[in-house]
């Protein structure tokens, strides 16, 4: 049973800034990382700079021995109208004919790198959706391992076809795994808005939480997850991914299996025999059926 913190407890947690960024925030407390889009005035739409910062923060989480779970969310509310958002996708103000134009003038589509980083990360990533999850932002919540949504403010909407864009990868195919082919096609082809409860009933949200308790609940889910074996959690994540990820998924899973094998006495015998220039002897090792 997952224990839940009260919202007042969450406010007093001593989050520590890992690194100061311009368009995201990146904090950590007790092994839980909190990464948030920080452009609430535009519903947390992302630019190439946002995505570069997000990717760097996720890589830091991937490599850290001190971080066990990642919470991905959006800062808010908006200073313009008080609205909340997780992420509303790519900022159309910097969209060009060949991608999204960064400050260096180069057109890029680097949000797909972030999707892959979340998908292949060796840790659980939880989307914490306080408001709008739209377009590319909707795809990001889909690719996360779990999603918690604000009962009062979360809205799920896929606007790709409205702006002549499309996510033909995880954002659509993996969504269909979650909600079924017919509902996924409805979400994309009609572009309707869905409440947190509707998203939960479809199967793309794990829990609907009162807004004031959303982040506290996310933190408690993260802490509960961290009580589990990190190796088992990692292998379970990659195993669950494997059926959809083809040879890439197989490579990720097999790589981690090889790492586990390196810790066995059998692997040590193979290494030592090579270094000592002697005949290897695997005869003493069991052959489990």
Located regions from the model:
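C-terminal long alpha-helix characteristic of the crotonase
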Residues: 40, 81, 149-154, 205-252, ...
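Glycine- (often His-adjacent) and acidic-residue-rich active-site loop
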Residues: 42, 74-117, 162-164
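Well-ordered beta-strand positions
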Residues: 146, 186, 190-192, 198, ...
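Conserved CoA-thioester-binding segment of acyl-CoA-metabolizing enzymes
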Residues: 2-75
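CoA-thioester-processing core
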Residues: 114-120, 128, 134-188, 202, ...
């Amino acid at each position: 049973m997952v224990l839940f913190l009260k919202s007042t407890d969450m406010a007093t947690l001593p989050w520590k800034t890992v690194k100061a960024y311009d368009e995201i925030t990146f904090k950590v407390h007790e092994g839980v990382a909190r990464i948030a889009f920080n452009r609430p005035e535009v519903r947390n739409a992302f630019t190439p700079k946002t995505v570069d910062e997000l990717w760097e923060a996720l890589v830091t989480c991937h490599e850290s021995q001190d971080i066990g779970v990642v919470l991905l969310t959006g800062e808010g509310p908006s200073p313009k109208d008080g609205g909340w958002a997780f992420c509303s996708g790519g900022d159309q103000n910097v969209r060009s004919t060949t991608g999204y134009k960064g400050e260096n003038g180069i057109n890029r589509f680097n949000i797909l790198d972030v999707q892959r980083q979340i998908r292949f990360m060796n840790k659980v990533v939880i989307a914490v959706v306080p408001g709008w999850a739209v377009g590319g932002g909707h795809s990001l919540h889909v690719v996360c391992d779990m999603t918690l949504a604000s009962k009062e403010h979360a809205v799920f909407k896929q606007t790709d076809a409205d702006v002549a864009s499309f996510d033909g990868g995880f954002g659509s195919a993996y969504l269909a795994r979650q909600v079924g082919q017919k509902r996924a096609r409805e979400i994309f082809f009609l572009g309707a808005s869905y409440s947190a409860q509707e998203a939960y009933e479809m199967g793309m949200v794990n829990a609907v939480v009162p807004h004031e308790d959303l982040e506290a609940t996310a933190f408690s889910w993260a802490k509960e997850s961290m009580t589990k074996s990190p190796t088992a959690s990692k292998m379970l994540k990659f195993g669950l991914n494997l059926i959809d990820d083809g040879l890439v998924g197989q490579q990720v899973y097999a790589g981690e299996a090889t790492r586990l094998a390196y810790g066995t006495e059998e692997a040590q015998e193979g290494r030592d025999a090579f270094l000592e220039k002697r005949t290897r002897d695997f005869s003493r090792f069991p052959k489990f059926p």
